[in-house]
Design a protein with these regions (language model features):
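Lipid interaction determinants
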Residues: 15-70, 76-134
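Sec-dependent N-terminal signal peptides
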Residues: 3-13
Length: 134
């Protein structure tokens, strides 16, 4: 799967001389729709969690600690945002997707400086130690 991700990312950046290219939310969702993306901190590569994109608007987020939540995906202003059913009302997690050296990343818009790398995209479902809340 990693080879497929690398080839897809290389195709998206063909002809680009920039070392870092911002992706639109739709370009990001094109890569992960109906797939599962694994996220890690950057640059330390500590596991953060795995997100199964059930559709372009619904996910199951499995944190590294094994807990899970359903998410609603929205886009706007160049951001991909997630609202999880176990967060307090009004809490949103928004990210700006980008490519750097043919690797896929997301940068937080609320926690400045937080960057995560998508280290794998697969067709495997998420594994949770508990069922999502709703």
């Amino acid at each position: 799967m990693r080879v497929i991700l690398t080839l897809a990312l290389m195709a998206m950046t063909a002809g680009s001389a920039a070392a870092q290219d911002r992706l639109t939310p739709d370009q990001f969702l094109d890569l992960v729709d109906q797939r599962t993306a694994s996220f890690a901190t950057f640059p330390n590569r500590q596991p953060v969690g795995t997100e199964q994109f059930l559709s372009r608007t619904r996910t199951v987020w499995a944190r590294a600690n094994g807990t899970c939540a359903y998410g609603v995906v929205t886009t706007g202003d160049g951001q991909v945002c997630f609202d999880y059913d176990d967060d307090p009302p009004g809490v949103r997690h928004c990210w700006v997707p980008f490519l750097r050296d043919a690797r896929l990343f997301v940068a937080s818009t609320s926690d400045l400086g937080e960057v995560q790398e998508v280290i794998d995209i697969s067709d495997d479902p998420v594994a949770c130690t508990q069922a999502p809340i709703s």
